[in-house]
């Protein structure tokens, strides 16, 4: 049983593999490697929170006298096949908004301890989709429903072997008619759920 999962990112790879080496006289040895994928369920992430459900996340963002919105995500922790639900409320709209989009961003940080505090941070958009097209009005509510299952996601990793971390953020972006961008990021924690165990109904036991 391995402590860490396999991971292939922008600057970091964590591999488990079998290596076969065949020594040959008067020739270079023959070397072959076979990668092994390791995934760990993380039910303990919930248990560490004393089985308390993750509270909704409520945030406000705005520009004085021009824009004021509130947005809400139903939780702060999601498993990799979960659905993110939320709402966006427009309380004040005095700028001309063209559209609004939501992105899932993966941020990878790496750097060994003792390197004068130098760390490398790289971000990539996993998905970006349009929530709204056209100008909203005061009092409008826009729903959020994002299915995580089809996305290429990993759990949140924190200080793996004191070498790297992986975090995920929801990035809400509004673009006005002059192509100015207003955004707000919120970190969410992802974890891997244990696979479901199917039970036979024919008396043959569990398979």
Across the structure, where does each feature detected by a protein language model lie?
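C-terminal beta-sandwich interaction modules and adjacent acidic
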Residues: 1-207
């Amino acid at each position: 049983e391995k402590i860490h999962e396999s991971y292939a990112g922008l600057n970091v790879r964590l591999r488990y593999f079998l290596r076969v080496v065949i020594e040959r006289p008067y020739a270079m040895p023959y070397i072959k490697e076979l990668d092994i994928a390791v995934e760990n369920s993380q039910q303990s992430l919930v248990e560490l929170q004393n089985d308390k459900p993750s509270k909704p996340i409520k945030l406000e963002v705005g520009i004085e006298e021009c824009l004021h919105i509130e947005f809400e995500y139903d939780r702060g922790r999601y498993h990799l096949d979960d659905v993110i639900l939320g709402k966006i409320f427009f309380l004040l709209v005095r700028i001309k908004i063209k559209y609004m989009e939501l992105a899932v961003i993966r941020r990878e940080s790496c750097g060994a301890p003792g390197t004068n505090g130098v760390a490398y941070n790289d971000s990539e958009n996993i998905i970006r989709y349009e929530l709204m097209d056209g100008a909203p009005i005061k009092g409008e509510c826009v729903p959020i429903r994002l299915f995580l299952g089809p996305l290429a996601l990993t759990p949140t990793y924190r200080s793996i072997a004191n070498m790297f971390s992986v975090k995920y953020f929801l990035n809400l972006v509004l673009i006005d008619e002059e192509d100015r961008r207003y955004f707000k990021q919120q970190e969410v924690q992802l974890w891997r759920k244990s696979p479901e165990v199917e039970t036979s109904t024919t008396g043959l036991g569990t398979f």
